[in-house]
Amino acid sequence: MRSDPRVAQIVSDSGAYSDKEPLLLASGKIGIYYSNTELTLRDGNAYKKHENDSLAMLNYALEREFAEPTFAEIIDALTERVKPLLSDRYEEVAIAGGQTRDWLFSGPVAARLAIPHISLYKDGKIELIYGPGEAELEPRLRKSYAVHIGDLITSGSSTYSPLENPSTGWVPMLRAAGVTVDNSFTVVSRLQGGEENLAQGNVQSNSLVFIDEDFLRKHSKNPERAVAYKKDPDAWSEQYLRENGALAFIANFDPNGKNLVRARRFLEHHSHILKDAGRMKGLEAAVLEQFGKPLDEIVVVGGK
């Protein structure tokens, strides 16, 4: 797996890759660098005003292609790589993307290829976008084929998660609607198990940029730390938790916040380490003090 060197440089120059203090990823694992692929739009996150309207988001992304040439370069590269993946065994083919940031990349690719875009919403709604001004709710999608396009893959859980029963994610959502999907293409891969996870769901994962040791040595501001983490994220994370505890992640346990699934997954992965290191009681006390509720009332490990 080799990164597209031009897209890798755009990702770095735009701040779409950045070194961070330890934080929680959507998978519940700990990360020390972050990939905000949407920053390649260079729009100051203005896209967020369209985050609940896929048609508006797709039209906005098309506008950004003309306003930001380097963003258009990414769409060029995606389109070139995705086009051969479209199966000629189906009468209807489409590009699919999930709410919200997938749409920034999946929409323009669908427009370039002059094929429909399947917009997947977190609440289960599906729209079929035929062009810049037409959206169909609850479309008939049976016997069609789609390639999923995303902004980023880490563990791949938003695309396909076998941990839930039944499995969840954009791919099961498409398949439940009658769409055949066996390819997913993202701008950036963190190479943290997402490809292997999607393979369990019979989905081939592809990316333009891979956050591997070569990328980190070239683009990280702290390459020694980044490469050490990259070589064994779990070992690095365990050492961090034993030495520092989990207080840096306390905001994720806000009972009124948006990261409770992330917090639950964190505990599922790491609570045994915190207990063994004598750090769990410190987290429980901090959560109770800050949010006024016991940790086990806010986050039920093993729950939905």
Language model segments and positions:
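PRPP-associated nucleotide enzymes
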Residues: 1-304
